[in-house]
Structures are given as structure tokens and as C-alpha cells.
């Protein structure tokens, strides 16, 4: 039977529970254990699909089409285990399920309550089949202890601690140790009060993971242990790391995996960890041969968490080419307000990337960025919205279709990009009506694509058959293919039925590729996505020229 590790947070949000969970999962894997990571999100949205990126950050899409929390991206990148819709649940999903059951009469007239019905759904999710031979299931609870929204989740994991066999549950609490510079002191009171709140719910943490800017003095460690009722060795220091891929090494050095195994009584029989690959990647990130500067011209650049997987995929591409990747974040709107700014910001970059986005705001600036990259032979990578902008740019400036636009921006006589109303998933036809609901209506998840033999992308992938994850409502209009291809922008990747353009590229350019899907979602530190490795390789080549 699998053992369960519950990771909670206190004091403030955004301390890094997702990263801590992923790092612990990687450490357990390094000892030969099989792991599965899951996330409980207390918000009332059914999923983050319709949430603002500024509110939630990136929406991470799984192979089976679930729109999930960005922490699942950390889980996949650190463990290599692909997540599914069974690995993320929200209060909105739980309430939706309960109300549907109540309307069907499944509760046989009982009064539906938070306990036992809501907590029961949470426990069912936690205990649902993690897969064959899984040794540890790591459950991250979103938010912080004391949040009203989180109370049913904390109650559910408290109950599970009593219901699971003895020695099959471990509680880790991530907290903050602020350093007051004016006093020159590290303060433990916030941690003490956070643990007090957790214990008032009925949960005694086994391990405290303490985020801190400075090393924890031994006296403070003993003080925390005494007041929080844990052993001093279970007060784990979690300082900022040089890069996130050094976090597993740092946590191992502090003894996190050792303490977890000790809680389960497995320390004496646990295999020694093999952290070789983590040491290698950490070394490569710390000792690059060079540096490339990538301009990301987007819509949500004010919050880099909106592009979390994209940033990591570019870092992975840098690892593949042994270079450090620097980011120049640019709002598309900036190029609309000041055209002269384009040359100032882009002339000396080594690559231009336009990522996914929704809506018209900033689109004209992104189109101008595409044009500049094309005309000045700067490596260009367009992802989802970025591919659509490349198509519109070619249509307007090279094919003479001056009114070329997207129906996402409003009515147009030349819909180069239009709303998808039908597509195929497996053997089922998916249909979306004009003006329908937004939630859960996109073309999401893994879909096949066929690449043109001899094309650049076929060479990059080493295959003409690929499968990538998508998240979009709008698609390039295949009816414009002949006119756009006449400009040199070739459709070199299509859906298996030949109706949906998936990839475009230019042969008359050092590196110019647009893709309708999101390759960043499948990139891993130890297996960089080939498109990102190739793009950064082209940027590295340009860095030698400018």
C-alpha cells in the first residue's frame, strides 16, 4: 500500500510548496521509490481555465486535456511522471460533483454537509488509484493554514491520518522565518503561530520546512522544535537556491528525505540516493559557456508565473546548448505605443519569442515584433498565439492581404485566424458553438500532428509523427494556405486529417518556426524539448554574430 505525504503551508502564500513537493518527489525517486504527486486547490473555480493569468499564473495542461495548477508542471519536470486530471482537484469541482449527486438523489434524502460529504469527496480523491507499484503519494494542499476555503481540506487530511494504517501518513508544514533587518534577528513567532493553528485543527506536523534568507542558528532551531513539538532534526532549513534544480540537492543536504523516511520507519532499509544527474545539471547551470538574450514579447509579462513552463523550457534549451538564458520581458502594447522602441529593444537580442495569449490587447505590437525578427534574420519562435501572429504578419506584409486579422479581435473580411467550431479527439467529434460558455471549451490536451518530410521541424524532431499538448480556441484558416505559402511561410505540420495547421516555418530564415501547440509543457530538465534546444542553439549561433 502507498504511503501518503501531506504538504501544507503557513504564514504567507507563495513560499514554494509546489517546488518543495516536486523536490521531495525527486529525492524519493533518487532512492528508487515510485512516486505520484497531487494538488488540492481550495478555490471555488471548477478549474483555472478561465482565471486571469495575473490571478493564477500559468494554466498547466495535461495529456488528457485537464487545465490545472502550474505546480503540476513542477511535478512533471522534477519527476518525469506525466500528470493527469486525476492529480488536481478544486473546491469548485467537489461542490459541482456533490450538487449533481444531490440532484440525482444519490444521498437518499440525507442532509448534505461539509462533513462528511465534502470531506468524503476530498478523501476519495486523495485515495484514488495512484497507479501500479506507487510507493509514495505526495499531496500538496493549496493556500495557507487558517484560510476559510481550506478548512474542509485540512479536516479531510486530518481524518486520513487516523484512517490510514499506522506509519502510512506524514505531515510536512512549510513556513516562513522572517529576518528583521533593523533588529538583526530571525523571528520564529510566525512559525510558532502557524503550527499552533495547524495543531488546533488536529494536525501535528512531523517535519517543518522553514523558508529563510539566512542559515538558522542552532539555538533558534531548538526553540522552534520545542514550541512546535518536533525534533530539532525535523526543523529543515530551506534557503533560496542558485537555481530551482539545485533545490533537491539542498534539501537532501539538510536531511529532508532522511527525516521523511524516518517518519515512515524506512530509513534503515532505504536505498542510498543517486543524485548524479541533479549534480550534473546544477553544475551546468552554474558554469555555462556563454549567454543568450531572448526577448519574450507577450501579454502577461508583468507576472512571469504566467509563463512558468515557458521559462523552464528555455532554461532546458540553454542546458542542452550549455548557455545561460537571459530574458527580456516586453509587453506587446509597448511596441504599439512607440514603433521606434522595437529596434531599440530587439536589434541586439539573440532570439524573439511570442508566447500564447488571448484577446486583441498587444497583438499589433506582437505582429511588429514578428516582422522585425523576420526582416532582420533574428531567430523567431511563435507559440500558439505567436504562430497566429506570424501568419497574420505574412498575410498583411507579404501576401498583400491588408485586412488580414483574427475573428478573436472582431469581425474581419480576411479571417486568417478563426474560431474552431469542430475538431476530432480520438474518434469523437468535439463541437463548440459561437457565443458558448468559455469554461472547458478549448481544444485541450495531446493531439497528433504530421510533419512534412524534409522540413526543418521534421529534422528537429527526428520524426514526421508527433504528439503535443494544445490549449486554444482559435486556429489558422487552412483556406489561406496557398496565398501564405507563396510568401515563403510554409505549413509544415498539420493535423492527421490535414485540416488544422499545426506548424509553420521559413526556409529563407536562420530559424523561424511557429507552432499552434504548447511544446513547453512537455520539456524536462533531463530531456529538453527539441524545439527549445534547437531555438536556443540558433540564438547561440546569432550571439556570435552580434
Swiss-Prot record:
Binding site for L-glutamine: 54, 357, 385-388, 408, 473
PROSITE patterns per UniProt: GATASE_TYPE_1 (PS51273)
GO biological process, one term: pyrimidine nucleobase biosynthetic process
InterPro entries for the chain: Class_I_gatase-like (IPR029062), CTP_synthase (IPR004468), CTP_synthase_N (IPR017456), GATASE (IPR017926), GATase1_CTP_Synthase (IPR033828), P-loop_NTPase (IPR027417)
A GO CC annotation given for this chain: cytosol
Annotated UTP binding sites: 13, 187-192, 223
Region (Amidoligase domain): 1-266
Catalytic residue list: 384, 518, 520
Record-linked SUPFAM superfamilies: Class I glutamine amidotransferase-like, P-loop containing nucleoside triphosphate hydrolases
TM ranges: none
Gene3D superfamilies: 3.40.50.880, P-loop containing nucleotide triphosphate hydrolases
Recorded GO MF terms: ATP binding; CTP synthase activity; glutaminase activity; identical protein binding; metal ion binding
EC number: 6.3.4.2
Chain ranges of the Glutamine amidotransferase type-1 domain: 293-545
UniProt activity-regulation remark: Allosterically activated by GTP, when glutamine is the substrate; GTP has no effect on the reaction when ammonia is the substrate. The allosteric effector GTP functions by stabilizing the protein conformation that binds the tetrahedral intermediate(s) formed during glutamine hydrolysis. Inhibited by the product CTP, via allosteric rather than competitive inhibition.
Binding residues for Mg(2+): 71, 140
Residues the entry annotates as binding ATP: 14-19, 71
Metabolic or biological pathway, per its Swiss-Prot or TrEMBL entry: Pyrimidine metabolism; CTP biosynthesis via de novo pathway; CTP from UDP: step 2/2
Record field: catalytic activity: UTP + L-glutamine + ATP + H2O = CTP + L-glutamate + ADP + phosphate + 2 H(+); L-glutamine + H2O = L-glutamate + NH4(+); UTP + NH4(+) + ATP = CTP + ADP + phosphate + 2 H(+)
Positions contributing to CTP binding: 13, 147-149, 187-192, 223
Other observations noted: CTPSs have evolved a hybrid strategy for distinguishing between UTP and CTP. The overlapping regions of the product feedback inhibitory and substrate sites recognize a common feature in both compounds, the triphosphate moiety. To differentiate isosteric substrate and product pyrimidine rings, an additional pocket far from the expected kinase/ligase catalytic site, specifically recognizes the cytosine and ribose portions of the product inhibitor.
Known role: Catalyzes the ATP-dependent amination of UTP to CTP with either L-glutamine or ammonia as the source of nitrogen. Regulates intracellular CTP levels through interactions with the four ribonucleotide triphosphates.
Database matches in NCBIfam families: PRK05380.1 (NF003792), PyrG (TIGR00337)
Family of this protein: Belongs to the CTP synthase family.
Complex and partners: Homotetramer.
Protein name (Swiss-Prot/TrEMBL): CTP synthase
Gene source species: Phenylobacterium zucineum (strain HLK1)
Gene transcribed to yield this protein: pyrG
Amino acid at each position: 500500500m502507498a504511503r501518503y505525504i501531506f504538504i501544507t503551508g503557513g504564514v504567507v502564500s507563495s513560499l514554494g510548496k509546489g517546488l518543495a513537493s516536486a523536490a521531495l518527489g525527486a529525492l524519493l525517486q533518487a532512492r528508487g521509490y515510485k512516486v505520484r504527486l497531487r494538488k488540492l486547490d481550495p478555490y471555488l473555480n471548477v478549474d483555472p481555465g478561465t482565471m486571469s493569468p495575473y490571478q493564477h499564473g500559468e494554466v498547466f495542461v495535461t495529456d488528457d486535456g485537464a487545465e490545472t495548477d502550474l505546480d503540476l508542471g513542477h511535478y512533471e519536470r522534477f519527476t518525469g511522471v506525466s500528470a493527469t486530471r486525476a492529480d488536481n482537484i478544486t473546491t469548485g469541482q467537489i461542490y459541482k460533483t456533490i450538487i449533481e449527486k444531490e440532484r440525482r438523489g444519490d444521498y437518499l434524502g440525507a442532509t448534505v454537509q461539509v462533513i462528511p460529504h465534502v470531506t468524503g469527496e476530498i478523501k476519495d480523491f486523495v485515495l484514488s488509484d495512484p497507479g501500479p507499484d506507487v510507493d509514495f503519494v505526495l499531496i500538496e494542499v493549496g493556500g495557507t493554514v487558517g484560510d476559510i476555503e481550506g478548512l474542509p481540506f485540512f479536516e479531510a487530511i486530518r481524518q486520513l491520518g487516523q484512517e490510514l494504517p499506522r506509519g502510512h501518513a506524514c505531515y510536512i508544514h512549510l513556513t516562513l522565518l522572517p529576518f528583521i533587518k533593523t533588529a538583526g534577528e530571525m523571528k520564529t513567532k510566525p512559525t510558532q503561530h502557524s503550527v499552533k493553528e495547524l495543531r488546533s485543527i488536529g494536525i501535528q506536523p512531523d517535519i517543518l520546512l522553514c523558508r529563510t534568507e539566512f542559515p538558522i542558528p542552532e539555538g533558534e532551531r531548538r526553540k522552534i522544535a520545542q514550541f512546535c513539538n518536533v525534533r530539532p532534526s525535523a526543523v529543515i532549513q530551506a534557503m533560496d537556491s542558485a537555481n530551482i534544480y539545485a533545490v533537491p540537492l539542498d534539501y537532501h543536504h539538510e536531511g529532508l528525505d532522511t527525516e521523511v523516511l524516518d517518519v515512515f520507519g524506512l530509513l534503515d532499509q532505504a536505498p542510498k540516493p543517486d543524485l548524479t544527474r541533479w549534480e550534473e545539471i546544477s553544475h551546468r547551470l552554474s558554469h555555462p559557456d556563454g549567454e543568450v538574450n531572448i526577448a519574450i514579447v507577450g501579454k502577461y509579462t508583468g507576472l512571469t508565473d504566467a509563463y512558468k513552463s515557458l521559462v523552464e523550457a528555455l532554461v532546458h534549451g540553454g542546458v542542452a546548448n550549455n548557455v545561460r538564458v537571459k530574458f527580456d520581458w516586453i509587453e506587446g502594447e509597448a511596441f504599439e505605443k512607440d514603433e521606434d522602441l522595437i529596434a531599440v529593444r530587439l536589434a541586439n537580442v539573440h532570439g524573439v519569442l511570442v508566447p500564447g495569449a488571448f484577446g486583441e490587447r498587444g497583438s499589433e505590437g506582437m505582429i511588429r515584433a514578428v516582422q522585425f525578427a523576420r526582416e532582420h534574420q533574428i531567430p523567431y519562435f511563435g507559440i500558439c498565439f505567436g504562430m497566429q501572429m506570424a501568419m497574420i504578419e505574412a498575410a498583411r506584409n507579404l501576401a498583400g492581404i491588408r485586412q488580414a486579422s483574427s475573428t478573436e479581435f472582431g469581425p474581419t473580411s480576411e479571417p486568417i485566424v478563426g474560431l474552431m467550431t469542430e475538431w476530432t479527439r480520438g474518434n469523437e467529434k468535439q463541437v463548440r458553438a459561437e457565443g458558448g460558455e468559455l469554461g472547458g471549451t478549448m481544444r485541450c490536451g495531446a493531439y497528433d500532428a504530421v510533419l512534412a518530410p524534409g522540413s526543418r521541424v521534421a529534422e528537429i524532431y527526428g520524426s514526421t509523427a508527433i504528439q503535443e499538448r494544445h490549449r486554444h480556441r482559435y486556429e489558422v484558416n487552412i483556406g489561406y494556405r496557398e496565398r501564405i505559402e507563396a510568401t515563403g511561410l510554409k505549413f509544415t505540420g498539420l493535423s492527421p486529417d490535414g485540416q488544422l495547421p499545426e506548424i509553420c516555418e521559413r526556409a529563407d530564415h536562420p530559424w523561424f518556426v511557429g507552432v499552434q501547440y504548447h511544446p513547453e509543457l512537455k520539456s524536462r530538465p533531463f530531456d529538453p524539448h527539441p524545439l527549445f534546444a534547437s531555438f536556443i542553439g540558433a540564438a547561440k549561433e546569432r550571439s556570435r554574430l552580434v
